[in-house]
A protein has these predicted regions:
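Boundary regions of SH3-family modules and the immediately adjacent low-complexity/disordered segments
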Residues: 1-30, 36-96, 100-103, 107-114, ...
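A short glycine-leucine-enriched loop at secondary-structure breakpoints
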Residues: 117
Length: 169
């Protein structure tokens, strides 16, 4: 486990392995940043491991560095762990950015079952379609989720990815 993709619409990155700490005004959150669906991160220490600083992580917390260099801690249920080969394959695919909040549906029509609701900034893999599918699914884009399921989003909700997710890898 060296890499992961955020597998929830908005994942929380904490500055410490615990979610709260004692502050001047009592208990305060250790939230530092967030990772959006489909964004990549490097896993520095696996859940339950010992960090290079000698800190024992809880069994459900991973130490990560985001693709833009933010260091923190994430609950493992918010991540899809991938091998290095899988990460590079993912980054080489036709990635698209969610330009506005949108639903991922099971079918290319509003009657599809909602599989997930994504926020602006999430990343999806656009899937190739035949000419017949493009015509039949007009206005919809076929996408692949981090867990391997296929879904559909309105194509007007998608934008090209304008950044590289390999900054710290």
């Amino acid at each position: 486990m060296k890499y992961a993709l955020f597998s929830v619409p908005v994942g929380t990155i904490y500055d410490l392995p615990q979610t709260i700490k004692e502050g001047e005004e009592g208990l305060v959150s250790t939230i530092g940043d967030e990772g959006l669906y489909g964004q990549a991160c490097q896993v520095r220490t696996a859940p339950g491991g010992v960090t290079t600083a000698g800190v024992q992580l809880p069994p459900d917390v991973a130490e990560v560095v985001s693709f833009y260099g933010y260091h923190g801690y994430v609950n493992q249920r918010e991540l899809q762990f991938v091998r290095e080969e899988e990460l590079w394959e993912y980054l080489g695919e036709d990635l698209v950015l969610v330009g506005r909040a949108t639903d991922v549906l099971s079918l290319p029509k509003v009657q599809g079952v909602r599989m997930m609701e994504l926020e602006r900034g999430g990343v999806l893999r656009r899937q190739p379609e035949t000419a017949e599918e493009v015509e039949a699914h007009k206005g919809w884009a076929k996408v692949l989720l981090t867990d391997g399921r296929t879904g559909y989003v309105r194509d007007v909700a998608l934008e090209p990815v304008k950044y590289e997710m390999t900054a710290v890898f």
